[in-house]
Amino acid sequence: MIAHASRSLSIIGAGLAGSLLAILLSRQGWRITLYERRGDPRVADYESGRSINLALAERGRNALRQAGVEDEVMARAVMMRGRMVHPREGEPQLQRYGRDDSEVIWSIHRSDLNTTLLELAEQAGATVHFHRRLHTVDFDAGYARFIDDRDDSPHDIRFDTLIGADGAGSALRAAMNRRAPLGEDIAFLDHSYKELEIPPADDGSFRIERNALHIWPRGHYMCIALPNHEGTFTVTLFLPNQGDPSFATINTGAQAEALFAREFADTLPLIPNLRADWEQHPPGLLGTLTLDRWHQQGRAVLIGDAAHAMVPFHGQGMNCAFEDCVALARHLMEADDLEGAFAAFEAERKPNARAIQQMALENYLEMRDRVADPAFLLQRELEQELQRRWPTRFVPHYTMVTFLHTPYAEALRRTELQRDMLVAATTGHDSLDNIDWAALEAQIHAQLPVLEGAH
């Protein structure tokens, strides 16, 4: 165990991961100080660089459970049973995520979650300093300078160890990279996103089905909508950066309204502020960040988006970051020194982060192109039947990622095996009537051992 005299940590970023890690470590006896470049969201209008609604899955709930804060968070969450797919023509169809209401995900607004976790971090004993933007780090001397952007005043601290929970544009990562290159690679998607809002009905109720993630798939672009506790939906349009239509061709609110009238007609009456929202909100970038190294000896380590930002299409960015928090807290308890803890943390989490980054990109293609594809729907039907027959062996991809604690890397390995089985078994078929069940059973028993936690 790390000596008591060394048990002081400074966390850069008081967002979701930073606040949760502060709770976990404060309760383990660490002296925790958080530094946040923005103001306190509890006393000022919430400002976030990225506010796509968050999908809370079992991995994230498990981390909240371990921190003892699950009940407080879940009071603000809205259940989503599945994807409500809105075709161009015809009625919306619900594609369930799991078998029943024990297998669902939850929508929560970033600001609600952040303020809740901040309150609980302070209650656990952490100290939070707002308006502190990391400017300079001297890793050898254990010295850091922060700037208050309200008046450009400097604030200097001495530190033992820094933890970077400051997001995809991490200032700590930049400082570490200047000291010794981290092997940083950022691959931006050729799509960006823009956020809009469906307000509540006049009586305060939800205007569309509240317990679903709504998707309007349209090939190379799509809309999604996630419910909020107060009756609103956060709508996100994902559109190419170039081509027609794209963010290069849809510039004005009037052009956006015409796009929605043509492609997402049933949403148009639901978004009364479409024109104004379009012109006020700039498009957000979508990218995948990979690093060769997440830590610098025992002086600094990165977690969450600061280490492995991903595209949001599997709803796992926050869940993965929360798993990081639990893993780092565990390694800090088990290791004899900080460098050993950070190295063990990186060795455990990096392969899993790479796996969910890949699966998030693949899920984008599925959501955008395949949820209305008959071949894909037949594979989904077969997947559900195989799960019914062999529930502990053939576990659907979404179940492994969202409802179990299967390491992401293992979930990816099994997913690729199962995908090959589904494609091979359904090729040339338009129903399950002539499926070779005996051959599939032999394959499943040979290639898919019983999965821990499956039932």
UniProtKB/Swiss-Prot annotation:
One of the GO BP terms on file: quinolinate biosynthetic process
Class of enzymatic activity (EC top level): oxidoreductase
Sample GO molecular function, one term: FAD binding
Function: Catalyzes the hydroxylation of L-kynurenine (L-Kyn) to form 3-hydroxy-L-kynurenine (L-3OHKyn). Required for synthesis of quinolinic acid.
Name of the protein in its database record: Kynurenine 3-monooxygenase
Cofactor dependence: FAD
Biological pathway: Cofactor biosynthesis; NAD(+) biosynthesis; quinolinate from L-kynurenine: step 1/3
Keywords assigned: FAD, Flavoprotein, Monooxygenase, NADP, Oxidoreductase, Pyridine nucleotide biosynthesis
SUPFAM superfamilies in the record: FAD/NAD(P)-binding domain (SSF51905)
UniProt record similarity statement: Belongs to the aromatic-ring hydroxylase family. KMO subfamily.
Catalytic activity entry: L-kynurenine + NADPH + O2 + H(+) = 3-hydroxy-L-kynurenine + NADP(+) + H2O
Organism field: Stenotrophomonas maltophilia (strain K279a)
EC numbers on record: 1.14.13.9
InterPro entries with a match to the protein in the record: FAD-bd, FAD/NAD-bd_sf, Kynurenine_monooxygenase
Gene: kmo
